[in-house]
């Protein structure tokens, strides 16, 4: 389901007519022709513990989204569920309040780690996983940790399994190999190679607001998402809660593009 959503948006960005542009601006609050800055990382895949340099790229919002969705599609195409589980660490890096659970074993099924014994989250990833894992190893090494809340979500639409997975994949850092060689600067600029995700964060990131409520009675993350959109802030492209809105499509909306 999430791959169908991403393919739909990939096609919309390839078409990019008046309808697609208007829908994009309505969802994100920012026009596609605006210029934004985007941070990515230069990584040394031969020495993954020693090299991690940030770079900043200026592009139009449209070019940023087009390349981002292409990379997200590649990641999603690699994700799979394997019926033969592999035991992984009990330690939960997303939730400090959760210690080891006595007699509890945690298993990974393909790329998905079953942590449904906790309702602290729907899902999470380690953002820097793409800094130490090249694209040809995504199928073997990338992990999506699944919490209990994920299973109560509908398949597609708002706050769904599909949009949640798009949210999580957007967290992975966009990376380039330290020794990458390009035929020309034009080739480098135009490349939409399958390296990492988008590098989004859960904003505001100065605290844990999973259960915090604003003065208006809304979850802090959701209120902040609305504020960014209404102020037409370019930070909507840094915030996974805003980013996932573009992927809140239902089944019929995805079918339309295949006619």
What role is predicted for each listed range?
Residues 1-162, 172-259:
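Predominantly extracellular/secreted Zn2+-dependent metalloproteases
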Residues 168:
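Walker B catalytic acidic pair
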